Amino acid sequence: MINGHGNNIQGLQHLLKADFSTNVFDNPQTGDLLDYLQTQLRAIRNYPDSECRLLREKLADKFNLSPGYILVTSGSTEAFYLLAHAFQKQCSAIRTPAFAEYEDACTLYNHQILFVEDLNELNNVKPSDLVWIGNPNNPDGRYLRPQQLVAFLEQNPKRLLVVDEAYIDLCEAAESMASLVGQHQNLVVIKSFTKLFAIPGIRIGYLLAHPQIIKKLQACHMPWAVNALALKAGEYILDLPEQPTVALDHRLQESKRMQAELAQVAGFRVFPSPTNYFLCELEQATAAELKKQLLKRHGFLIRDASNFRGLRPGHFRVAAQNKTLNNEFIHALKACINAIQPCLSYPSH
Protein backbone atom coordinates (compact mmCIF):
# COMPACT_ATOMS: atom_id res chain seq x y z
CA MET A 1 0.00 0.00 0.00
CA ILE A 2 1.41 3.31 -1.09
CA ASN A 3 1.06 4.90 2.36
CA GLY A 4 3.96 2.74 3.51
CA HIS A 5 6.30 4.36 1.04
CA GLY A 6 8.49 7.42 1.21
CA ASN A 7 8.53 10.70 -0.62
CA ASN A 8 6.15 11.87 -3.29
CA ILE A 9 8.10 14.55 -5.14
CA GLN A 10 5.27 15.59 -7.47
CA GLY A 11 4.41 18.58 -5.29
CA LEU A 12 7.99 19.46 -4.37
CA GLN A 13 9.70 20.28 -7.68
CA HIS A 14 9.64 24.02 -7.01
CA LEU A 15 11.74 23.43 -3.86
CA LEU A 16 13.89 20.50 -4.97
CA LYS A 17 17.56 20.89 -5.91
CA ALA A 18 18.59 17.25 -5.42
CA ASP A 19 16.78 14.12 -4.27
CA PHE A 20 18.83 12.21 -1.70
CA SER A 21 15.78 10.16 -0.72
CA THR A 22 15.59 7.86 -3.74
CA ASN A 23 17.93 4.88 -3.83
CA VAL A 24 17.74 4.17 -7.56
CA PHE A 25 20.88 4.71 -9.67
CA ASP A 26 20.98 7.14 -12.58
CA ASN A 27 22.63 4.65 -14.93
CA PRO A 28 24.31 6.23 -17.99
CA GLN A 29 22.72 3.47 -20.10
CA THR A 30 19.18 4.48 -19.16
CA GLY A 31 19.13 7.14 -21.89
CA ASP A 32 19.83 4.50 -24.54
CA LEU A 33 17.04 2.34 -23.11
CA LEU A 34 14.57 5.21 -23.35
CA ASP A 35 15.63 5.89 -26.94
CA TYR A 36 15.07 2.21 -27.76
CA LEU A 37 11.61 2.20 -26.19
CA GLN A 38 10.68 5.16 -28.39
CA THR A 39 11.16 2.84 -31.38
CA GLN A 40 8.98 0.12 -29.83
CA LEU A 41 5.78 2.05 -29.16
CA ARG A 42 3.86 0.05 -31.77
CA ALA A 43 4.11 -2.93 -29.41
CA ILE A 44 1.24 -1.45 -27.39
CA ARG A 45 -1.13 -2.11 -30.31
CA ASN A 46 -1.06 -5.83 -29.47
CA TYR A 47 -1.60 -7.80 -26.28
CA PRO A 48 1.69 -8.64 -24.57
CA ASP A 49 2.83 -12.25 -24.31
CA SER A 50 1.03 -13.37 -21.15
CA GLU A 51 3.73 -15.99 -20.53
CA CYS A 52 6.62 -13.54 -21.08
CA ARG A 53 8.42 -16.31 -22.94
CA LEU A 54 11.27 -14.38 -24.55
CA LEU A 55 12.18 -12.54 -21.35
CA ARG A 56 11.99 -15.76 -19.32
CA GLU A 57 14.29 -17.49 -21.81
CA LYS A 58 16.83 -14.68 -21.55
CA LEU A 59 16.67 -14.79 -17.74
CA ALA A 60 17.02 -18.58 -17.80
CA ASP A 61 20.22 -18.22 -19.84
CA LYS A 62 21.53 -15.57 -17.46
CA PHE A 63 21.07 -17.72 -14.35
CA ASN A 64 21.62 -21.15 -15.94
CA LEU A 65 18.10 -22.30 -15.08
CA SER A 66 15.16 -23.57 -17.09
CA PRO A 67 12.34 -21.05 -17.83
CA GLY A 68 10.09 -23.05 -15.50
CA TYR A 69 11.97 -21.51 -12.55
CA ILE A 70 11.03 -17.95 -13.55
CA LEU A 71 7.94 -15.77 -13.21
CA VAL A 72 8.00 -12.24 -14.66
CA THR A 73 6.04 -9.68 -12.65
CA SER A 74 4.90 -6.08 -12.86
CA GLY A 75 7.71 -4.91 -10.61
CA SER A 76 9.10 -6.75 -7.59
CA THR A 77 6.22 -5.50 -5.42
CA GLU A 78 3.73 -7.59 -7.39
CA ALA A 79 5.87 -10.63 -6.56
CA PHE A 80 5.46 -9.94 -2.82
CA TYR A 81 1.68 -9.84 -3.14
CA LEU A 82 1.58 -12.97 -5.32
CA LEU A 83 3.58 -14.89 -2.71
CA ALA A 84 1.42 -13.66 0.14
CA HIS A 85 -1.70 -14.59 -1.86
CA ALA A 86 -0.48 -18.05 -2.86
CA PHE A 87 0.49 -18.83 0.76
CA GLN A 88 -2.38 -16.96 2.40
CA LYS A 89 -3.23 -17.50 6.08
CA GLN A 90 0.20 -18.95 6.81
CA CYS A 91 2.81 -17.66 9.26
CA SER A 92 5.40 -15.19 7.98
CA ALA A 93 8.50 -13.96 9.79
CA ILE A 94 9.84 -10.61 8.60
CA ARG A 95 13.32 -9.34 9.45
CA THR A 96 13.04 -5.71 10.50
CA PRO A 97 13.43 -2.92 9.69
CA ALA A 98 12.06 -3.85 6.30
CA PHE A 99 10.36 -2.60 3.16
CA ALA A 100 6.73 -1.98 4.16
CA GLU A 101 5.25 -4.06 1.34
CA TYR A 102 6.31 -7.38 2.92
CA GLU A 103 4.09 -6.66 5.91
CA ASP A 104 1.33 -5.04 3.85
CA ALA A 105 1.10 -8.03 1.50
CA CYS A 106 1.05 -10.52 4.37
CA THR A 107 -1.57 -8.50 6.23
CA LEU A 108 -3.80 -8.33 3.15
CA TYR A 109 -3.76 -12.12 2.85
CA ASN A 110 -4.27 -12.81 6.56
CA HIS A 111 -0.84 -14.11 7.50
CA GLN A 112 0.17 -14.42 11.11
CA ILE A 113 3.22 -12.13 11.19
CA LEU A 114 6.30 -12.38 13.39
CA PHE A 115 8.95 -9.67 13.47
CA VAL A 116 12.62 -10.46 14.13
CA GLU A 117 15.78 -8.37 13.94
CA ASP A 118 18.02 -11.28 13.01
CA LEU A 119 17.49 -14.69 11.42
CA ASN A 120 19.02 -16.34 14.49
CA GLU A 121 16.01 -15.16 16.50
CA LEU A 122 13.80 -17.57 14.56
CA ASN A 123 15.17 -20.42 16.64
CA ASN A 124 13.50 -18.89 19.69
CA VAL A 125 10.07 -18.07 18.24
CA LYS A 126 7.10 -20.00 16.92
CA PRO A 127 7.97 -21.75 13.64
CA SER A 128 7.05 -19.74 10.56
CA ASP A 129 6.11 -20.97 7.11
CA LEU A 130 7.77 -18.08 5.25
CA VAL A 131 10.75 -15.88 6.13
CA TRP A 132 11.14 -12.52 4.35
CA ILE A 133 14.41 -10.58 4.11
CA GLY A 134 15.83 -7.83 1.95
CA ASN A 135 19.40 -8.56 0.85
CA PRO A 136 20.78 -5.96 0.83
CA ASN A 137 18.14 -4.63 3.14
CA ASN A 138 16.11 -1.48 2.76
CA PRO A 139 16.52 0.93 4.57
CA ASP A 140 19.84 0.08 6.27
CA GLY A 141 21.81 -1.79 3.58
CA ARG A 142 22.53 -4.88 5.69
CA TYR A 143 23.85 -7.70 3.51
CA LEU A 144 24.19 -11.43 4.19
CA ARG A 145 26.59 -13.59 2.16
CA PRO A 146 25.13 -16.57 0.25
CA GLN A 147 26.91 -18.96 2.61
CA GLN A 148 24.92 -17.58 5.55
CA LEU A 149 21.63 -17.91 3.69
CA VAL A 150 22.43 -21.40 2.41
CA ALA A 151 23.15 -22.48 5.98
CA PHE A 152 19.72 -21.14 6.99
CA LEU A 153 18.04 -22.98 4.10
CA GLU A 154 19.66 -26.26 5.06
CA GLN A 155 18.83 -25.85 8.76
CA ASN A 156 15.20 -24.91 7.99
CA PRO A 157 14.06 -27.17 5.13
CA LYS A 158 10.35 -26.63 5.92
CA ARG A 159 10.58 -22.85 5.85
CA LEU A 160 10.33 -20.91 2.60
CA LEU A 161 13.03 -18.22 2.52
CA VAL A 162 12.01 -15.18 0.45
CA VAL A 163 15.04 -13.07 -0.49
CA ASP A 164 14.35 -9.65 -1.98
CA GLU A 165 17.38 -8.71 -4.10
CA ALA A 166 16.02 -5.47 -5.56
CA TYR A 167 19.19 -3.64 -4.49
CA ILE A 168 21.78 -6.37 -5.09
CA ASP A 169 23.22 -4.58 -8.15
CA LEU A 170 23.87 -1.50 -6.02
CA CYS A 171 25.80 -3.40 -3.33
CA GLU A 172 29.58 -3.64 -3.31
CA ALA A 173 30.94 -7.15 -4.03
CA ALA A 174 27.51 -8.72 -3.57
CA GLU A 175 26.62 -12.21 -4.79
CA SER A 176 23.10 -13.14 -5.85
CA MET A 177 21.25 -16.22 -4.64
CA ALA A 178 19.39 -16.49 -7.96
CA SER A 179 21.37 -19.36 -9.46
CA LEU A 180 20.88 -21.40 -6.27
CA VAL A 181 17.11 -21.83 -6.60
CA GLY A 182 17.73 -25.01 -8.59
CA GLN A 183 19.47 -26.51 -5.55
CA HIS A 184 17.04 -25.40 -2.83
CA GLN A 185 13.31 -25.98 -3.15
CA ASN A 186 12.66 -23.71 -0.16
CA LEU A 187 14.28 -20.62 -1.73
CA VAL A 188 12.52 -17.76 -3.53
CA VAL A 189 14.55 -14.88 -4.99
CA ILE A 190 12.87 -11.66 -6.12
CA LYS A 191 14.72 -9.28 -8.42
CA SER A 192 14.08 -6.00 -10.22
CA PHE A 193 15.36 -3.96 -13.15
CA THR A 194 14.21 -0.75 -11.47
CA LYS A 195 17.08 0.22 -9.18
CA LEU A 196 20.08 -0.16 -11.50
CA PHE A 197 18.38 1.48 -14.48
CA ALA A 198 16.23 4.06 -12.66
CA ILE A 199 12.98 2.94 -14.34
CA PRO A 200 10.47 2.57 -11.48
CA GLY A 201 7.66 3.80 -13.71
CA ILE A 202 8.00 0.87 -16.13
CA ARG A 203 7.20 -1.80 -13.48
CA ILE A 204 9.26 -4.83 -14.44
CA GLY A 205 10.65 -7.47 -12.09
CA TYR A 206 10.83 -11.23 -11.72
CA LEU A 207 10.82 -14.08 -9.27
CA LEU A 208 12.93 -17.24 -9.27
CA ALA A 209 11.82 -20.39 -7.45
CA HIS A 210 11.23 -24.12 -7.84
CA PRO A 211 8.71 -24.87 -10.66
CA GLN A 212 6.16 -26.16 -8.13
CA ILE A 213 6.17 -22.76 -6.44
CA ILE A 214 6.04 -20.97 -9.79
CA LYS A 215 2.90 -22.94 -10.76
CA LYS A 216 1.30 -22.04 -7.43
CA LEU A 217 2.00 -18.37 -8.10
CA GLN A 218 0.79 -18.52 -11.70
CA ALA A 219 -2.61 -19.61 -10.41
CA CYS A 220 -2.87 -16.22 -8.66
CA HIS A 221 -1.37 -14.15 -11.48
CA MET A 222 -3.82 -12.19 -13.61
CA PRO A 223 -3.46 -12.42 -17.42
CA TRP A 224 -1.30 -9.81 -19.19
CA ALA A 225 0.00 -8.52 -15.87
CA VAL A 226 3.22 -7.27 -17.50
CA ASN A 227 2.75 -4.70 -20.24
CA ALA A 228 4.39 -4.81 -23.67
CA LEU A 229 6.84 -1.93 -23.13
CA ALA A 230 7.96 -3.37 -19.80
CA LEU A 231 8.77 -6.65 -21.56
CA LYS A 232 10.69 -4.77 -24.26
CA ALA A 233 12.67 -2.95 -21.57
CA GLY A 234 13.61 -6.17 -19.78
CA GLU A 235 14.63 -7.87 -23.02
CA TYR A 236 16.74 -4.87 -24.05
CA ILE A 237 18.54 -4.72 -20.70
CA LEU A 238 19.40 -8.42 -20.79
CA ASP A 239 20.83 -8.03 -24.31
CA LEU A 240 23.21 -5.28 -23.21
CA PRO A 241 26.89 -6.32 -23.16
CA GLU A 242 28.61 -6.25 -19.81
CA GLN A 243 29.74 -2.67 -19.24
CA PRO A 244 32.45 -1.23 -16.99
CA THR A 245 30.83 -0.15 -13.75
CA VAL A 246 32.87 3.04 -13.36
CA ALA A 247 29.85 5.25 -12.63
CA LEU A 248 28.45 2.82 -10.06
CA ASP A 249 31.87 2.31 -8.47
CA HIS A 250 32.19 6.07 -8.05
CA ARG A 251 28.75 6.23 -6.47
CA LEU A 252 29.60 3.45 -4.01
CA GLN A 253 32.87 5.18 -3.10
CA GLU A 254 30.95 8.39 -2.52
CA SER A 255 28.56 6.53 -0.25
CA LYS A 256 31.51 5.25 1.81
CA ARG A 257 33.03 8.72 1.99
CA MET A 258 29.76 10.29 3.10
CA GLN A 259 29.25 7.62 5.75
CA ALA A 260 32.75 8.17 7.14
CA GLU A 261 32.40 11.96 7.25
CA LEU A 262 28.91 12.00 8.74
CA ALA A 263 29.91 9.45 11.38
CA GLN A 264 32.12 12.17 12.89
CA VAL A 265 29.18 14.52 13.51
CA ALA A 266 28.25 14.85 17.18
CA GLY A 267 24.77 13.62 18.10
CA PHE A 268 24.55 11.66 14.88
CA ARG A 269 24.78 7.94 14.11
CA VAL A 270 25.53 6.30 10.75
CA PHE A 271 24.76 2.62 10.13
CA PRO A 272 27.53 1.24 7.87
CA SER A 273 26.23 0.09 4.48
CA PRO A 274 27.92 -1.48 1.42
CA THR A 275 25.29 0.08 -0.87
CA ASN A 276 24.71 3.50 -2.43
CA TYR A 277 22.30 4.31 0.42
CA PHE A 278 22.66 4.25 4.20
CA LEU A 279 20.62 4.76 7.36
CA CYS A 280 21.28 7.55 9.86
CA GLU A 281 19.86 8.52 13.24
CA LEU A 282 19.64 11.86 14.99
CA GLU A 283 20.01 11.46 18.74
CA GLN A 284 18.12 14.58 19.81
CA ALA A 285 15.91 15.65 16.91
CA THR A 286 13.36 14.18 14.55
CA ALA A 287 13.98 13.17 10.97
CA ALA A 288 10.73 14.93 10.05
CA GLU A 289 12.09 18.28 11.23
CA LEU A 290 15.47 17.71 9.57
CA LYS A 291 13.74 16.79 6.31
CA LYS A 292 11.65 19.95 6.48
CA GLN A 293 14.65 22.20 7.14
CA LEU A 294 16.89 20.60 4.51
CA LEU A 295 14.23 21.01 1.84
CA LYS A 296 13.21 24.53 2.86
CA ARG A 297 16.72 25.95 3.31
CA HIS A 298 18.78 23.98 0.80
CA GLY A 299 16.48 22.11 -1.60
CA PHE A 300 17.69 18.67 -0.50
CA LEU A 301 15.24 15.82 0.11
CA ILE A 302 15.93 12.89 2.47
CA ARG A 303 13.82 9.83 3.30
CA ASP A 304 12.25 10.08 6.75
CA ALA A 305 12.58 6.43 7.83
CA SER A 306 10.67 6.71 11.09
CA ASN A 307 7.70 4.83 9.60
CA PHE A 308 9.77 1.66 9.13
CA ARG A 309 8.78 -0.86 11.81
CA GLY A 310 11.39 -0.92 14.57
CA LEU A 311 12.90 2.48 13.78
CA ARG A 312 12.64 5.68 15.78
CA PRO A 313 11.67 9.31 15.04
CA GLY A 314 15.31 10.23 14.40
CA HIS A 315 15.98 7.69 11.65
CA PHE A 316 16.36 8.74 8.02
CA ARG A 317 17.90 7.33 4.84
CA VAL A 318 20.34 9.01 2.47
CA ALA A 319 21.30 7.93 -1.06
CA ALA A 320 24.65 9.20 -2.35
CA GLN A 321 24.73 11.41 -5.46
CA ASN A 322 27.71 12.92 -7.31
CA LYS A 323 30.64 14.34 -5.36
CA THR A 324 29.69 18.00 -5.79
CA LEU A 325 26.13 17.49 -4.58
CA ASN A 326 27.30 15.22 -1.77
CA ASN A 327 29.68 17.90 -0.47
CA GLU A 328 26.89 20.49 -0.57
CA PHE A 329 24.56 18.07 1.20
CA ILE A 330 27.06 17.30 3.98
CA HIS A 331 27.56 21.02 4.61
CA ALA A 332 23.79 21.64 4.61
CA LEU A 333 23.11 18.67 6.87
CA LYS A 334 25.62 19.83 9.46
CA ALA A 335 24.15 23.33 9.42
CA CYS A 336 20.61 22.05 9.88
CA ILE A 337 21.59 19.66 12.66
CA ASN A 338 23.34 22.46 14.55
CA ALA A 339 20.23 24.58 14.16
CA ILE A 340 17.61 22.06 15.29
CA GLN A 341 19.23 19.64 17.76
CA PRO A 342 19.55 22.00 20.74
CA CYS A 343 15.81 22.67 20.83
CA LEU A 344 14.23 19.41 19.67
CA SER A 345 14.17 16.04 21.34
CA TYR A 346 12.03 12.96 21.67
CA PRO A 347 11.78 10.39 24.47
CA SER A 348 14.19 7.49 24.47
CA HIS A 349 12.88 3.92 24.61
Feature annotation, model-predicted:
Residues Q29-D32, E51, N186-Q264, F268-F271:
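PLP-dependent aminotransferase class I/II
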Residues M1-N46:
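N-terminal "arm"/small-domain region of PLP-dependent enzymes with the aminotransferase-like
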Residues L252, V265-H298:
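Conserved PLP-binding catalytic core of the aspartate aminotransferase-like
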Residues G31, A285-K292, T324-E328:
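Short, conserved charged micro-motifs
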Residues L119-E121, K126, P139-L161, E165-I199:
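Active-site pre-lysine segment of PLP-dependent enzymes
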Residues H85-P139:
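PLP-dependent aminotransferase-like
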Residues Q147, K296-R297, G310-H349:
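PLP-dependent enzyme catalytic core of the Aspartate aminotransferase-like
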Residues C52-R53, P67-Q90:
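Conserved beta-loop-alpha segment that forms the PLP phosphate-binding cup at the N-terminus of a helix
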